[in-house]
Regions:
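Active-site-adjacent structural elements in enzyme catalytic cores
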Residues: 1-188
Length: 188
């Protein structure tokens, strides 16, 4: 059995691109120097990268969570899928530190109990109020919106030269789990 491999259109460890403009910002000089082009098919629909499943053993294992969950796979195929339990990275994006902007990402659970630096960004679901003095990078209404806007928001923080981005991670399973996986790595 052979796997499928495709390169990411960003520099290793950096925030993943979700638009052609992001690819150009990361790789434009390299592409221009080699006469390569960027094919713009519009912004990514989901935002966070795909689910990666290892299907070589008797039970498939999710190596990287994404929009497709273990429950989705079981519902469609009837096959039980487990989640990776080892800390050893086996796939892209599984290092402790990955998807990282230049700004420091700090995960917080409660806005009212936090002290914030000035000139910092903020990302949370829309119903969470923006603390005074912070720059709201996005106001996603749903978990799906959060996933779609996550990387663009982290890149916007870098574009604004923010030193810190405070994030209130969404709670829940499924896509929220994938978002939290990416946020944990960005904050490492």
């Amino acid at each position: 059995m052979k796997g499928v491999v495709a390169p990411s259109a960003n520099r290793f460890g950096h925030v993943s691109p979700t638009s052609a403009a992001h690819v150009s910002a990361d790789l434009g000089e390299y592409l221009d120097a080699h006469g390569d082009l960027i094919l713009d098919g519009g912004d990514c629909q989901v935002g966070v990268e795909s689910t990666i499943v290892l299907a070589t053993g008797s039970q498939p294992v999710i190596l990287r969570p994404g929009a497709v969950t273990a429950a989705d796979i079981k519902r469609i195929t009837g096959v039980e899928v487990s989640e990776e339990t080892t800390n050893a990275p086996r796939v892209s994006g599984a290092l402790d530190s990955h998807y990282s902007p230049t700004a420091q990402v700090i995960l917080i659970t409660a806005v009212s109990q936090s002290t914030f630096e000035s000139k910092a960004g903020f990302l949370a679901l829309a119903q969470t109020p923006t603390p005074t003095g912070l720059v709201r990078l996005a106001s996603p209404e749903t978990i799906e919106d959060f996933a779609h806007e996550l990387y663009g928001s982290l890149r916007a923080g870098d574009d604004l030269k923010l030193k810190t981005i405070y994030v209130v991670p969404p709670s829940g399973d499924g896509l929220a789990q994938a978002i939290n996986d990416r946020l944990q790595r960005a904050a490492f």
